[in-house]
Amino acid sequence: MSRTDQLALAVSLLAVFAAALVAGNIFENVPHLEDEIAYVWQARLLVEGKLTIPSPQHEKSFLVPFVVDHNGERFGKYPPGWPLVLSLGVALGTRGLVNPILAGVGVWLTYLLGKRVFGPLVGLLAAALTLSSPFFLINSGSLLSHPLGLVLSAGFALLWLAAFGDRNAPRRWSYSLGAAVLMGLLILARPFTALGVALPFGLHGLYLLFYGGCTPEQRRQTRLHLLGFGALGLAFAGLHFLWQYRVTGDPFLNPYTLWWEYDKIGFGPGVGVTEDGHSLHIARINTRFSLRAAWRDLFGWSSYSWLFLPFGLLACLRKPKGLLLGVVFPSLVLIHIFYWIGSELFGPRYYYEGLYSLTLFSALGAAWLAGWRVEPDPEPQDYPGAVRQSSGGVGLLDRLRLRLAPAYSWFAERAASAVHQPALFKVRQYLVPMALVLLVAYNLVYFLPGRLWEMHGLYTISRSDLYPFLAPEAQELTPALIIVHSERWMSYGSLLELQDPRLTTPFIFAWSRGPIADEAVAADFPERNLFHYYVEEPGRFYLAPRDP
């Protein structure tokens, strides 16, 4: 392991520690969003090896956000990929460490991607920038599925480049099928995100079908591996539809629409919350807000987190593999135009799985400006196609590059001369690193603490909501049915942390829906002590509804 590898590993371990701090001190290791509550509910059920359970008799009183009741069965609306991973933490009693560990893996994979395509220094800088990112830390401390998505996306990209990054290199099934497995797992975790991640690589694969080698044998091997990749990917996609069939009885019924009928992909009436449905105008507004959040939360440099991206693009013009990594984020932005809602609270989290596009290109741009080495370690070129390529075996992209070479050379020479003048050589060597240090320091000292604290007590949910039920005197009241009197779901939803899906825990909670409904619920649990709980009076349990 090289010195740079050791530093990258240290940064990755630091990411685990930092994310765990955010999970414990900001989010208090409890779910806040409806999504998180549903994920935890699904994970607890998966520990039992179940996808569904029979719906409770009074399903509206025992509402769980984003958990659906359909045809007498109760199940989460989310695909099983992330709940299955989270269930490992639930089973081991380490639920709060699952995403921090995934965060560390995501940082390490970002380093490996940068090292492979741009060199170890760029990879290390990208890993460090990722660690400093408020966007990264907020999502890594949550119970959302995005950290898993980032690991699967980055791991897939790394294996794809190993399998198909050099169109003339020998193909290895371990790489091509490994890439298919990771893409398949992403489909089972976040299917729409998987589409956005796969889009640029799919276009690359189409190119390789026709120009994937200099010899007939190389092209045959490339096509065989691409077909194997596609077949395995389709098998995982089939598992997604099998899951939909298992929980809904219809392989093409999206459980999202069982909670909100309008929660669909596309445009027009019936899609989204507006009367006329989702439209390009709404998509433009959503995208603008999401990107504004991205430039704020990416590195915490006010609204200038994009500062080094143009220079990264300029430095990458001669690196097709780098461009392939760089378009993952824009691809996610593009496909989410078809979704009716944007994302800002946790940053633009629907684009999170393309985070490495931004961190790698920012690191590349900074390194290029500073005059650092931005070339990967040379790969061995002793396979047969390497010689033939130089003797005329070129494909479409190679021919296009040759045709554009004069124009590119003119542009590149002038850009380089503007930035890399000898008089500025020493200046930029020191100026760019100093600017980076100042920008990161600004984020760590001024922006990041406040941005993280904004998320503390999100939706008025806090671990302190659970304390009245954890007190020894409260435990003596169990087994108990608690009728929660609250106008908003948050005060009721925060207590679901103490309840299992089968309603067998010492405390179970029902959301009050009026005297008649509450009495009917109580009649179903004669073996439990009945109490009424008013969230504005924490720690006080009423034997009967209090007077208005």
Where are these regions (language model features)?
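Signature aromatic-anchored transmembrane alpha helix within multi-pass, membrane-resident enzymes
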Residues: 7-13, 202, 230-234, 360, ...
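Hydrophobic/aromatic-rich transmembrane helices and adjacent perimembrane loops
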Residues: 39-40, 139-140, 146, 189, ...
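Perimembrane helix-loop-helix junctions
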Residues: 159-167, 172, 196-237, 241-242, ...
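Transmembrane-helix signature of polytopic, membrane-embedded enzymes
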Residues: 8-12, 92, 108-133, 150-151, ...
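Hydrophobic, aromatic-rich transmembrane alpha-helices
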Residues: 105-107, 204, 211, 288-326, ...
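Membrane-interface transmembrane helices that cradle and orient dolichyl/undecaprenyl
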Residues: 85, 115-118, 156-176, 186, ...
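Transmembrane-helix motifs of polytopic, lipid-linked glycan transferases
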Residues: 95-121, 155-159, 311
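Short helix- or helix-capping micro-motifs
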Residues: 123-131, 154, 158, 179, ...
